């Protein structure tokens, strides 16, 4: 916690300078706004007189290492294979947290979002295959299965505190299960020819990370170092490197080093020492007792938390406000031409468009309706099926996740460009339509109490 967060702390000049940025990043929809800005910039850049510089930038080779131990890849591949591995690492941390202590911890709680996510994956894939089955484009069935959680939640947050908390939690849980589905699709269906030796190296690295967890190692550095080996091994094995992020997250310790009873007793003792040491006006630097007391509280705070929480808290801002906007900037720059517009009416583009737009809303709503009708799940008080239909619209915002899967699903650059254009069109319609529908459904509703 910085001093600007503490009531009564004297504001510093840097606080006034950074205040506008802090206000922006405190807005729930800020990551979605940045994503949208990056997308618009990419589209304008790719369709301007500087389009050649746009494509040349991402094609530049970047080399990491030295001599025979160097890895050289185009900048866009460092983004898609490297930065996106960090994104999937954070996704993996979220999945693990939700399974252990969140909406997916209880089978009864988890039933509704899991069923909705499965419906929201199967129906879009089915629509796509109905239009493209047996063709060269059939491999793209995984593209309309994806949901962009940042955009979907960002648009939902624009509706303010009239949105029931249960709906926000539901959409988050659906997106997390959806991400898990996307991870499995990437791992099992969009994997190149496998290298057994590198696969074994990756398996060994993952086993070492699990061993570190079992031994009670709570420092992040050992996991980071072994995780880099895991990433490199999977990159060379043929399995997509982003899977290393998910596997690494599964090995991160998720339990506190202190039992609740021990934590309570130690906390009381630490606070007592802290209060006694802080008596008087002696500066901290001049008092060894005060310095020791502060250090003691810091150590207790670190032990009370979990490595999973610390990593998620530290990495989430980087993912939301840097990695995803950079990914959008590098991948959303589709050059619009007459040929590209005509391709929007091809089965590939139509399969993605209708899969995201109709498949998501139909799959999510149908799954919720079936579970409620069969008595397996109940809708929260004051929330009707219509609101879940609105959530189905927002789940059709595939954007970054769908674009990422499209880059893996297709080899033909023309197919990739057509898929990107279709994803952008479907995501825009789903986002705008979902926002307008939810706005109507929430009209006259009392704001949620904090």
From Swiss-Prot:
Signal sequence coordinates: none
Catalytically driven reaction(s): Na(+)(in) + 2 H(+)(out) = Na(+)(out) + 2 H(+)(in)
Organism, scientific name: Oleidesulfovibrio alaskensis (strain ATCC BAA-1058 / DSM 17464 / G20)
Entry GO MF terms: sodium:proton antiporter activity
Transmembrane regions: 24-44, 75-95, 111-131, 140-160, 169-189, 196-216, 224-244, 318-338, 352-372, 390-410, 422-442
Family: Belongs to the NhaA Na(+)/H(+) (TC 2.A.33) antiporter family.
A biological process term (GO) from this entry: regulation of pH
Name of the protein described by the UniProt record: Na(+)/H(+) antiporter NhaA
UniProt xrefs under NCBIfam families: NhaA (TIGR00773)
Keyword terms: Antiport, Cell inner membrane, Cell membrane, Ion transport, Membrane, Sodium, Sodium transport, Transmembrane, Transmembrane helix, Transport
Gene Ontology CC entries for this record: plasma membrane
The keyword Endoplasmic reticulum is annotated on this UniProt entry: no
Subcellular locations according to the entry: Cell inner membrane
Physiological role: Na(+)/H(+) antiporter that extrudes sodium in exchange for external protons.
């Amino acid at each position: 916690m910085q001093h600007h967060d503490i009531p009564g702390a004297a504001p510093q000049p840097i606080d006034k300078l950074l205040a506008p940025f802090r206000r922006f990043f405190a807005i729930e929809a800020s990551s979605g706004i940045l994503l949208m800005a990056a997308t618009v910039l990419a589209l304008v850049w790719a369709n301007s007189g500087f389009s050649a510089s746009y494509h040349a930038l991402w094609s530049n080779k970047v080399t990491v290492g030295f001599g025979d131990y160097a890895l050289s890849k185009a900048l866009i591949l460092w983004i898609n294979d490297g930065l996106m591995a960090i994104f999937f690492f954070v996704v993996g941390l979220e999945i693990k947290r939700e399974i252990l202590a969140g909406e997916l911890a209880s089978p009864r709680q988890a039933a509704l979002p899991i069923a909705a996510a499965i419906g929201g994956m199967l129906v879009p894939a089915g629509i796509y295959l109905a239009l493209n089955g047996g063709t060269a484009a059939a491999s793209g069935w995984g593209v309309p299965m994806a949901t962009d959680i940042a955009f979907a939640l960002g648009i939902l947050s624009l509706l303010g505190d009239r949105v029931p908390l249960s709906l926000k939690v539901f959409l988050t849980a659906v997106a997390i299960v959806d991400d898990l589905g996307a991870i499995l699709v990437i791992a099992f269906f969009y994997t190149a020819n496998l290298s057994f030796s590198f696969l074994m190296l990756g398996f060994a690295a993952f086993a070492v990370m699990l061993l570190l967890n079992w031994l009670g190692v709570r420092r992040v550095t050992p996991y980071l170092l072994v995780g880099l080996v895991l990433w490199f091994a999977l990159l060379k094995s043929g399995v997509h490197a982003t899977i290393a992020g998910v596997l690494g997250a599964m090995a991160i310790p998720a339990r506190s080093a202190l039992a609740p009873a021990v934590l309570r007793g130690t906390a009381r003792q630490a606070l007592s020492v802290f209060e006694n040491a802080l008596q008087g006006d002696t500066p901290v630097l001049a008092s060894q007792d005060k310095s020791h007391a502060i250090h003691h509280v810091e150590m207790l705070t670190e032990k009370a938390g979990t490595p999973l929480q610390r990593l998620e808290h530290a990495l989430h801002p980087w993912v939301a406000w840097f990695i995803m906007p950079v990914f959008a900037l590098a991948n959303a720059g589709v050059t619009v031409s007459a040929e590209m517009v005509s391709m929007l009416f091809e089965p590939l583009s139509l399969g993605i468009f209708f899969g995201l737009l109709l498949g998501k809303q139909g799959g999510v709503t149908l799954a919720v309706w079936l579970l409620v009708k069969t008595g397996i799940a109940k809708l929260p008080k004051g929330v009707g099926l219509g609101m879940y239909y609105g959530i189905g619209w927002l789940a059709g915002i595939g954007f970054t996740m769908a674009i990422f899967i499209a880059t893996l699903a297709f080899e033909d650059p023309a197919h990739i460009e057509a898929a990107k254009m279709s994803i952008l069109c479907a995501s825009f319609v789903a986002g705008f339509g979902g926002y307008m529908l939810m706005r109507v459904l929430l009209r006259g509703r009392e704001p949620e109490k904090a």
